[in-house]
Amino acid sequence: MSCWWKHFGDGRKLRILIARDDGEIVGIAPLMLSKYSFMRFGKLSKIEFVGSPHSDYNSFILLRKEVECLRFFLDHLIKDCSDWDYLQLRDIRENSRSGDLLCTMCDDDRPLQLERVIATLCPYIDLPDSVEAFMEGLSRNMRRNLRKRMARLRRDYDVEFRTYRDFSSVDEAMKTFFELHQKRWRSKDEEGAFSSREFRDFHLNMARVFSEKGWLSLYFLMVDDEAAAAAYTFDYKLKKYGYLTGFDPNYYPYSVGNLLKMHIVQDCVRRGLKEYDLMRDLEPYKADWASSQRRNLEVRMVRSGLFARVYDWVTKEGVPASLIQRTGVSLSRK
């Protein structure tokens, strides 16, 4: 969180709320105040989770007295903070304690005027005890295609799987990943996630920190000693989190992305991991692998102001984010 704030905190204000019971911390609300300008259309002062919109999962930290903590946080924001007009808490796992309690409050506490919406679907793979068991769970067609494409790739090239530890540094491995990710999106005439220098610098910083903690897991499929596909993942408590991928479009006929995914699953099973979380958004390349999916919730509240109500309506109606960006939305630095 501190890493994200270092790169994206400019123009925002922290609203970290702490609940104590007899002096002991029982809950933390990692929030911030962001002020957005929509050119001549209006301005919006929004309470949101630190890390939004980049974080795939957000949550309150609730150690004890969960209901009392949440009510304390919301009451404080409503009664004691007058500098915001819109609350948007994104990407809360539906099956988390925060998600359960917020759903109950949305249903029962009408005076709060909280509203929940289903924000995104998050696919994941339940990992079995053996690679053979996992392969049996795939469709016959997918198993056949994986075998055929790997055989063809090995026939045409010298193939090797590597991790970031095979590079001279974490930075070198990450820059190779950035290039593959961007190359894929440029082939579709789109920008890609790492077109922003700010976003690249953040992930370089985060990868260094995660590497030191033993959480970083960055995979590469090498073809004739050149990177053809890459996957940027994290490991934590017997779970793998798959953040982003990239591949060289020249190797698209070989399905190098799927071949690397198969290698990652095999590595997870051999290491005894229990789940491979494919994270936010159910895209086709994830759906082919997922054994199930979870939902992320979003909780909203309009506090005041006509523009806040208009913004709430527009975003609920499913107006594309790209269209909203055309209004010239920017983060106020004042």
What is the meaning of each model-derived region?
Residues F134-M135, E191-G192, D248-Y251, Q266-C268, ...:
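A short, structure-level motif marking secondary-structure boundaries and short turns
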Residues D225, D267, L278, A321-V329:
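A general structural signal for short secondary-structure boundary/capping elements
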Residues M301-K334:
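Membrane-proximal basic amphipathic "stem/tether" segments
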Residues K13-L14, S34-I118, F234-R295, R300-M301:
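Acyl-donor binding region in acyl/amide transferases
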Residues M1-E48, R90-P253:
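A conserved beta-strand-loop-helix scaffold within acyl/acetyltransferase catalytic domains
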Residues R64, L127, R165, R300-R303:
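Residues at the C-termini of beta-strands that transition into short coil/loop
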Residues E68, F167-D171, L306-F307:
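A short acidic, often aromatic-flanked loop/helix-cap motif at beta-alpha or helix-coil junctions
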Residues L77, E136-R144, W313-G318:
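Short intrinsically disordered coil segments
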